[in-house]
């Protein structure tokens, strides 16, 4: 008769019974992590063997017979079991001490380099301080020289711009004066033409007056010659016209007409000259005021452009300073971020190691508890088998004798359920009594659950 117990992480072996004695074999394989050691034991007529390895823990088999509790080999096996158990306990104690040492180191590290620590990284940078001060002094001196050169360059550029603006202003003023001179030349040409026209008219009138005077003299001479002759002509005619009076009247009329023309021409000339002089004066005043206003506006524009250039230079200098400051702070921020990342990496590594040590410690504690429970179970089994062995021995007597008296065997089977991490979930003990009357015949049975 045989039976096999199976579970997710355990295996129970077989139980063998024989007539001279009772043999009980049980195998229990537990999928729990171990520390790489093994154990085996034997009690009296029973033998117990087991092993604890990295892959799991296995509990061997034990045999009960009627020859007593401990034989020579069984004592050695028991001693081996005790030695291995002591070694296991020493290993557990060593691991606990190592874990405590590691926890103390972690605590010391947190006290020295933790977020609340005032020491920070325990590095001595005092030997670098003179070098840093020297480099800082050189950087400040180079920055000042660079700023001085930039300022000189800006001043030279502003001076060149100032001279360029002055040249442009003088050139514009020169062109304006040339334009005014050309305008005045055109006016002068017009006045010259008008004067020439008036002179031509004056000459024409003078010639006409001379011609009239000459005609008048000739007529007067002809009349005087005619009056001085001896010719007497008597005519009974109407009284004639007095030519002298007529000539005098004509002369007076022509003189009045010439005088009137002269006065009209002189008045027209004076009027035109006055209007032209007034226009020239007005244009000159307007030109002067416009020129003054243009000069003032150009001067204001030049001043504003100089201020704009200075403000642009100041803006550029401030932008350069801002860029340099931002670069320095970005570099410092990157260094601080790198230090923070390194510290976080160290902290993560320490936490990982701590969690690994904690997990290993919990596994060892679970293995320890499991082994202690197995040892207690084996002690219970050994206690029950001892009574069975004493009873069988009293009935059979010493030695291996063949009798037909009935034998009683008590078989205890421990069934344990384990989780994947090796922790015991439940434990059950099955007890079975069997009687056998056969002599020297070994019956191999597998006990049902």
From Swiss-Prot:
Q: Where in the cell is it found?
A: Cytoplasm
Where are the residues of the annotated region Head? 1-73
**Looking at the record, which segments are called Coil 1B?**
132-223
- Which terms does the UniProt entry file under GO BP? epithelial cell differentiation; hair follicle morphogenesis; intermediate filament organization
Region Tail, as annotated, extends over 386-449
In this chain, the stretch annotated as Disordered covers 425-449
The segments labelled Linker 12 in the record are 224-246
Specify where it is mainly localized: cytoplasm
Q: Where is the composition biased (Basic and acidic residues)?
A: 430-449
Q: Which domain of life is it from?
A: Eukaryota
Q: PROSITE patterns of this UniProt entry?
A: IF_ROD_2
- Provide this UniProt record's keywords sorted from A to Z: Coiled coil, Cytoplasm, Intermediate filament, Keratin
Q: Where is this region: Linker 1?
A: 110-131
- Tell me which residues make up the IF rod domain: 74-389
Q: Which Pfam families match?
A: Filament
Please give the function described in this protein's UniProt entry. Essential for the proper assembly of type I and type II keratin protein complexes and formation of keratin intermediate filaments in the inner root sheath (irs).
Which family is it part of? Belongs to the intermediate filament family.
Task: Note the subunit structure.
Answer: Heterotetramer of two type I and two type II keratins. Interacts with KRT6A to form filaments.
Q: What else is known?
A: There are two types of cytoskeletal and microfibrillar keratin: I (acidic; 40-55 kDa) and II (neutral to basic; 56-70 kDa).
**Full protein name:** Keratin, type I cytoskeletal 27
This chain's source organism reads Rattus norvegicus (Rat)
What broad taxonomic lineage does this protein's source fall under? Eukaryota, Metazoa, Chordata, Craniata, Vertebrata
Q: Corresponding gene?
A: Krt27
